[in-house]
């Protein structure tokens, strides 16, 4: 069985973020309560404390953050612009390439101790 890669915008914590690219053709996994598409940009308010981690060294698994995605097969390019109202420790927003709940890569900007950091997590059965 050929696996398809799901590429989308994974958005965590309480952020507003934007993205312009065929937004109307994408779909939600864990749809947030408040969101809109306007002027080719996605704006959302995300449930606090939501995230993507699988059997991490912290001892927990979560798969509950909003994820706006499209399904692709073969090669593709993704270009996104991410902005957010980062306020709380670990607020983050970015891009996730996902095959299923056990196999994904998420990368983005994470706010930790008053500083912005580039963050990447690779999950293959467990998150690194």
Mark where each language-model region is.
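Extracellular glycan-recognition regions
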Residues: 21-128
